Amino acid sequence: EPGHDGIGWLAQTGRIPLGYLGDAERSAATFPSIDGVRYAVPGDRVRRLRDGSIELLGRDAATINTGGEKVFAEEVEQALLQHPAVVDCVVVGRPSLRWGDEVVAVVQLRSGDDPSDEELLAEAGRHVARFKLPKALLRCEAMVRSPSGKADYRWARAQAVGA
């Protein structure tokens, strides 16, 4: 329903694949039938706004559960990218005894720039709630991405856990 505060799943109808070969459970989760209509649910979380448009929140696989709250990695990445020194960033969860997972950002800075963590977090804090801010910022010389430009969350998580 437009304007509802709830978060839902992006889904589509039409020409839908039959499913995953040999994986009935995954097929049922990704391609459910609801009231006789078959859907594809790729894992994107969304919110429908009052004007009927859809706000894409992020991939469910990149959602971080921290302190009982869900944090969409893409939302935090966009907030960090608002700082002019940040060229690229990837946000992941890192195991934490206190938080379950804590938000950690791997950031690539513009050559010659060296803002403090406090400066980066202050800018990001203007765009997202404080509980979503990274508990740690890790700097890298070059971000690892797939040939199509997708974030390599596995690499970023390894950086975060190894730090």
Each model region followed by its residue ranges:
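Glycine-/small-residue-rich beta->alpha transition segments that form the dinucleotide
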Residues: R15
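A short helix/loop element that forms part of the nucleotide-sugar donor recognition site in Leloir-type
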Residues: A24-A28
